[in-house]
């Protein structure tokens, strides 16, 4: 009677942690300087005015304002921050 008694454990069962990539602030949302707008691998979205590009391609706000997404003729999507108009005092 040949029976297998001690089978090895499966070779699967591993996975990497999710990186939580994607858009964090959508068009029209208010941001302050330093807010992360998009986390990405590579430049799926490109930096426009009043935003910075981190070394990991994170796009973040440089000034307070509202987020704006714009597709240019070259097909690239540019992320900008439109500063809020200061209230006249």
Swiss-Prot record:
Keyword Ligase applies: no
Biological process annotations from GO: translation
GO molecular function, one term: structural constituent of ribosome
Swiss-Prot/TrEMBL keywords: Ribonucleoprotein, Ribosomal protein
Alphabetized Gene3D superfamilies for the sequence: 2.40.50.100
Region feature Disordered, mapped onto this chain: 1-21
Any single GO CC term annotated in Swiss-Prot or TrEMBL for this entry: cytosolic large ribosomal subunit
Segments forming a coiled coil: none
Keyword Ion transport on entry: no
Family according to the record: Belongs to the bacterial ribosomal protein bL27 family.
Protein name: Large ribosomal subunit protein bL27
